[in-house]
Every structure is written in structure tokens, then in C-alpha cells.
């Protein structure tokens, strides 16, 4: 008996949005010959408009950084950022239009959450670029784990050996750490890199910085991330934005040490440009 949640993929669906499917899904539907031809056209040749469900709306250049604005079929736009490094190019992809999380330092959620991006819309942020990238980071607009199924599907498509064949160790998901999804990613056989946007060492402070994560226990989030690291033998990154007067005290340093000392963890301390949250913290550039 077929699972009630099973989606029957048709040739019409593939023709209308081919970037949303793996080689196996396409092959099962249209046969090996057509599947190989289509995958070659999608991932080995110059991008063709007839296969695209989005387009480059604008490009902003700034030194080693290039920001793309992509216009989606429904008229909404998302941003994708390319960063040149000594060892290649990193692309930072979006997973949502808007964001439901509401981090006080981030503009992505200023207009609230509008919708999730499809697997195809995530994949096209990589394939339509002018740059050839060797690292993909899921940390643009949106919280990747609140669009879990589409994000995981996009990774399977990007890793497909018959397509882009992107290496797993070149993929990183940055998340604020919803517990259910952290448990799910632990059981996936993807072995991707993981970054936890922590930004606090106690519940009260994290609830201020990430107000829409109030229902998630900070200690359990840390435990889950460390469990992922141990299970997959992967170094995880802890992103910690230093906000003067809010999360930069000696007690914060000590708590970070208690959690992560002798663990397979990289703590990435980030400096914030104060003005936008000066009112919240009582800090100004003159302090």
C-alpha cells in the first residue's frame, strides 16, 4: 500500500520546474535517456530561461562581495550573497521570503514571514549565479529548519551525482536551533556542516535577542547541537554576536566555557555595529 503522503511526480511537473527534482525522480518518470539529457542541460550547460522559475532582478557589487536579488514567479524577491575567499567562493542562500524568527539584529524578518521557498528556488540560487561556488551556506533570508523538508530536498538535489554533484562537506546550515528539527537532522545521513546561531548564554537574554524562540530551552538546544557533532564526528560552529551591555559579560564567557570546553566546536565571535539596537541595550557609539 502506498503512503498517503506520497506525491506522484508527473512529466508535466518536471517540465514546469525541473530544478526541483533529483535524477532518480526524473528518471523514474521520463526514462534514463531523457533524464540524462535534462540533467546535463540543467547543470552542465549555461542556464536556460525555459527551465527557470526565477530570474536575476539586480546585482550589487561590493569588493569581494556580490549580492543578487532574485525575482520569483509570484513577484516576491529574495537575496543571495556571494563572497570571494582565498580558497574559492561561498554562496549564502535564502530559504524563505521574510522570516518568522525576529532576531533583533536582522532585517530579514522586518516584514514578517511570507512563505517558504521551494527546493527548486533554493537550488536555482546556486545554479543561476555567474560565479562557480565551492561552498554553500544556508543563512540568507529565513530560518532553514522552519522550512526543513524543502531545505533537505534541495541538499539532495545539489549533491546528486548526476547533476551538480556538490560535495557534502561544502554545505553548511545555520540555524537558531528549533529542537524537533535538530533531532531530525541528527538522524539524516547527510553529514553536512552545522552552525548554531546562539547569541546568548541564558534563557532570558536569548528571549530578548531571538524573541520568537521563547519556547525553546537554550540548554536543550546546546545539548542537541553537541549530540549532532558527536554522532557525525563533525565540528560545529557556534555563532555569537557580541551586543554591548547585553551578552558580553564575564558570566557569558564562563558559561560558553562550561558548555563547549574540550568539545568539537568552533566559537565564532561576531562584532555588531551598535546603532540599530542601541535603544534596546542602552548603548550608543559614545559609550
Residue spans for each PLM region:
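Short beta-strand motif preference
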Residues: 68, 80, 91-93, 196
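A generic beta-sheet turn/junction motif
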Residues: 73, 84-86, 177, 189
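Residue-level structural signal for beta-strand termini and adjacent loop
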Residues: 82-83, 150
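Conserved AdoMet/S-adenosylmethionine-binding subsite of the radical SAM
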Residues: 131-135, 140-286
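Auxiliary Fe-S-binding modules of radical SAM enzymes
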Residues: 1-76, 84, 226-234, 242-287
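Short linear Ser/Thr-Pro motifs
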Residues: 59-61, 94-95, 108, 174, ...
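Canonical Radical SAM [4Fe-4S] cluster-binding loop centered on the CxxxCxxC motif
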Residues: 84-120, 128
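Cys/His-clustered metal-coordination modules, chiefly Zn-binding fingers
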Residues: 124
Amino acid at each position: 500500500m502506498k503512503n498517503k503522503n506520497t506525491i506522484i511526480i508527473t512529466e508535466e511537473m518536471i517540465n514546469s520546474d525541473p530544478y526541483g527534482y533529483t535524477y532518480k525522480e526524473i528518471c523514474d518518470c521520463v526514462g534514463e535517456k531523457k533524464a540524462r539529457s535534462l540533467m546535463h542541460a540543467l547543470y552542465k550547460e549555461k542556464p536556460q530561461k525555459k527551465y527557470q522559475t526565477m530570474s536575476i532582478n539586480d546585482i550589487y557589487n561590493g569588493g569581494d562581495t556580490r549580492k543578487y536579488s532574485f525575482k520569483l514567479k509570484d513577484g516576491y524577491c529574495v537575496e543571495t550573497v556571494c563572497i570571494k575567499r582565498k580558497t574559492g567562493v561561498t554562496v549564502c542562500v535564502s530559504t524563505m521570503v521574510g522570516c518568522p524568527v525576529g532576531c533583533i539584529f536582522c532585517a530579514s524578518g522586518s516584514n514578517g514571514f511570507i512563505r517558504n521557498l521551494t527546493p527548486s528556488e533554493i537550488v536555482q540560487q546556486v545554479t543561476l549565479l555567474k560565479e562557480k561556488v565551492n561552498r554553500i551556506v544556508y543563512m540568507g533570508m529565513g530560518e532553514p529548519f522552519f522550512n526543513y523538508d524543502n531545505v533537505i530536498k534541495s541538499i539532495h538535489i545539489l549533491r546528486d551525482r548526476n547533476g551538480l554533484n556538490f560535495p557534502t562537506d561544502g554545505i553548511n546550515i545555520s540555524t537558531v536551533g528549533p529542537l524537533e528539527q535538530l533531532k531530525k537532522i541528527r538522524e539524516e545521513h547527510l553529514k553536512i556542516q552545522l552552525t548554531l546561531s546562539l547569541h546568548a548564554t541564558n534563557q532570558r537574554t536569548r528571549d530578548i535577542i531571538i524573541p520568537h524562540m521563547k519556547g525553546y530551552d537554550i540548554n536543550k538546544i546546546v545539548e542537541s547541537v553537541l549530540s549532532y557533532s558527536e554522532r557525525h564526528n563533525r565540528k560545529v560552529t557556534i555563532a555569537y554576536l557580541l551586543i554591548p551591555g547585553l551578552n558580553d559579560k564575564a558570566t557569558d564567557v564562563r558559561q560558553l566555557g562550561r558548555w563547549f570546553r574540550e568539545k568539537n566546536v568552533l566559537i565564532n565571535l561576531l562584532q555588531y555595529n551598535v546603532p540599530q539596537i542601541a535603544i534596546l541595550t542602552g548603548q550608543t557609539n559614545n559609550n
